């Protein structure tokens, strides 16, 4: 009979089998389970009750719970015809966890997990077993102190699974990047030219300032920072500063947004009505050269154009032949259009024309008064003499 009993025992449940049963008794360091369809009870040591660290078996199970476990060892006492199955609930939980995580990895799904511990290299999380989020995969932004994450439930993506080495690597950064991309798409759709919105200066370059307007950076070109001439963006704004910006253009395909701070500020032209009039001669500073002329600042934020034809009495091919940025010049006001913020200026009109022939005013007037029919009256040759000799007609 003992032989028959042994054989049935061995053939009944073997090491590696998956079994189910009801928790019958909870002891200090183990749990007794009535294994379904088996001749002996199962024993689960406290170390095999959970994938998490527990101090008491009752932290993992309660009497009457129906649980599953793997058989890790079959113990049988032939002499007393008694036996027991050593079980691992932890092994089964780990297997199920890997199956779930592999499915999420294959389908690029997002999961949620609670941070159980903050360590030097990152975050330990509960994903049915121990998972790890390295510091480099915690956020798209730099974070110096991770302590605030302890106890938080995070959205994560599975980056790497290695069951053989009990290695589960997850990323919060990947989730953030995806969320940021979605927010960017939504924001780009909502932006309209002419809108005035609030943003924060994110970084400065020599050609302008990038402003964060809600997860997307737009560029304020250096020429759009102020009504006044700006040499360097850092002279006007600083990183972290909150500013109002006007949307000048949005290219949704290239995700480029052009912004202006200048357009949100009062125009200095509003304060010059009656200050500058046609014919006035004033001083200004050359701030910019173009192929068609030079822009001269005559008051902070107020620039006028000296057309290339108004720079010199002599022919010039380029404004740079006569002028350079920073040069102080005298200009004559040719016209003022405050409504359209345009001022026409002339440098030429303030300069003597060396090509104009100087004449004796009295002699010339005499010629004009008396005419040239009388032979006693002077001719043009008499008036100008040798002055006409070198002049080309």
Curated annotation (Swiss-Prot):
Keyword Ribonucleoprotein belongs to the record: yes
Entry's Gene Ontology molecular function annotations: mRNA binding; structural constituent of ribosome
Superkingdom of origin organism: Bacteria
Coiled coil: none
Entry-linked SUPFAM superfamilies: Nucleic acid-binding proteins
Residue ranges of domain S1 motif in the record: 16-90, 108-173, 194-262, 279-348
Any one of the GO CC terms: ribosome
InterPro entries xref list: NA-bd_OB-fold (IPR012340), Ribos_protein_bS1-like (IPR050437), Ribosomal_protein_S1-like (IPR035104), S1_domain (IPR003029)
UniProt xrefs under Pfam families: S1
Compositional bias annotation for Polar residues: 356-369
GO biological process, one term: translation
Keywords: Repeat, Ribonucleoprotein, Ribosomal protein, RNA-binding
Positions of region (Disordered): 356-381
Transmembrane found in the keyword field: no
Protein family according to the UniProt entry: Belongs to the bacterial ribosomal protein bS1 family.
Summary of the function given for this chain in its UniProt record: Binds mRNA; thus facilitating recognition of the initiation point. It is needed to translate mRNA with a short Shine-Dalgarno (SD) purine-rich sequence.
Protein name: Small ribosomal subunit protein bS1
């Amino acid at each position: 009979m003992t032989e028959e009993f042994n054989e049935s025992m061995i053939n009944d449940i073997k090491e590696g089998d998956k079994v189910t049963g009801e928790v019958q008794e909870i002891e200090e360091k183990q749990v007794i389970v009535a294994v379904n369809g088996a001749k002996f009870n199962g024993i689960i040591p406290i170390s095999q009750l959970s994938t998490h660290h527990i101090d008491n078996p009752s932290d993992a199970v309660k009497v009457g719970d129906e649980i599953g476990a793997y058989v890790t060892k079959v113990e049988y006492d032939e002499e007393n015809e008694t036996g027991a199955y050593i079980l691992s609930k932890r092994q089964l939980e780990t297997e199920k966890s890997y199956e779930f995580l592999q499915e999420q990895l294959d389908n690029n799904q997002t999961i949620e997990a609670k941070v159980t511990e903050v360590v030097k290299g990152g975050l330990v999380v509960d994903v049915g077993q121990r998972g790890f989020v390295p510091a480099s995969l915690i956020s798209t932004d730099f974070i110096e102190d991770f302590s605030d994450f302890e106890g938080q439930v995070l959205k994560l993506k599975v980056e790497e699974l290695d069951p053989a080495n009990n290695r589960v690597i997850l990323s919060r950064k990947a989730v953030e990047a995806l969320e940021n991309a979605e927010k960017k798409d939504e924001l780009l759709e909502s932006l309209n030219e002419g809108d005035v919105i609030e943003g924060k200066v994110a970084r400065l370059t020599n050609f302008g300032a990038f402003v964060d307007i809600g997860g997307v950076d737009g560029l304020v070109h250096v020429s759009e920072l102020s009504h006044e001439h700006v040499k360097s963006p850092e002279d006007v704004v600083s990183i972290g500063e909150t500013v109002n910006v006007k949307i000048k253009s949005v290219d949704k395909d290239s995700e480029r947004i052009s912004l202006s701070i200048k357009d949100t500020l009062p125009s200095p032209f509003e304060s010059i009505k009656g200050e500058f009039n046609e014919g006035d001669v004033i001083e200004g500073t050359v701030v910019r050269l173009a192929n068609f002329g030079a822009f001269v600042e005559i008051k902070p934020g107020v620039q006028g154009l000296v057309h290339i034809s108004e720079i010199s009495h002599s022919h010039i091919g380029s404004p740079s032949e006569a002028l350079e940025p920073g040069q102080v010049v005298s200009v004559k006001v040719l016209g003022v259009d405050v409504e359209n913020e345009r001022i026409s200026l002339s440098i030429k009109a303030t300069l003597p024309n060396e090509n104009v022939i100087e004449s004796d005013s009295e002699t010339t007037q005499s010629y004009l008064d008396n005419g040239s029919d009388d032979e006693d009256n002077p001719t043009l040759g008499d008036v100008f003499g040798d002055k006409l000799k070198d002049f080309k007609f």
